[in-house]
Amino acid sequence: MSQEIAVVGSPEFTTGFRLAGVRKFENIPDDEKDERLDDAVERTLDDEGTGIIVMHTDDLDHLSRGTREAVEGSIEPVLVTLGGSGAGSGGLRDQIKRAIGIDLMEEDD
C-alpha cells in the first residue's frame, strides 16, 4: 500500500505543500492551535494512508504531553519538523536516526 505525506499546521504553512501536490493536510489557524492541534495530529497519526507527517517545529509546543510523545515516538508515520530555531529543532539527521534506529552519518574513528 502506498502511503502519502500529510501536513499539519497553519494555512500559511500548509499552502506551499498543497501547491506542490500534497493532498493530505490539516489547517489549524494560529489562534486555534491550543484547542484543535491535538485532535488534528491524532487523526493524522491514526490514518493508515499516511507515512510522513510534516509540522512546523514551533507547533510542537501547542501539543499536549501525551500527543507530543506519541507523535515524536511514532515510527510509522514518522514526524518531520521544519523551521524553528529552538532546542527542539534537532535537524534532519536526528529525525532520520529516530525513524530508522541508526545514525547513517556516524563517522568511524
From Swiss-Prot:
Keyword Phosphoprotein: no
UniProt cross-references to InterPro entries, sorted A to Z: ATPase_V1-cplx_f_g_su (IPR008218), ATPase_V1-cplx_fsu_bac/arc (IPR022944), ATPase_V1_fsu_sf (IPR036906)
An individual GO BP term: proton motive force-driven plasma membrane ATP synthesis
Any one GO CC term of the record: plasma membrane
Keywords per UniProt: ATP synthesis, Cell membrane, Hydrogen ion transport, Ion transport, Membrane, Transport
Family statement: Belongs to the V-ATPase F subunit family.
Subunit structure: Has multiple subunits with at least A(3), B(3), C, D, E, F, H, I and proteolipid K(x).
Protein role: Component of the A-type ATP synthase that produces ATP from ADP in the presence of a proton gradient across the membrane.
Protein name: A-type ATP synthase subunit F
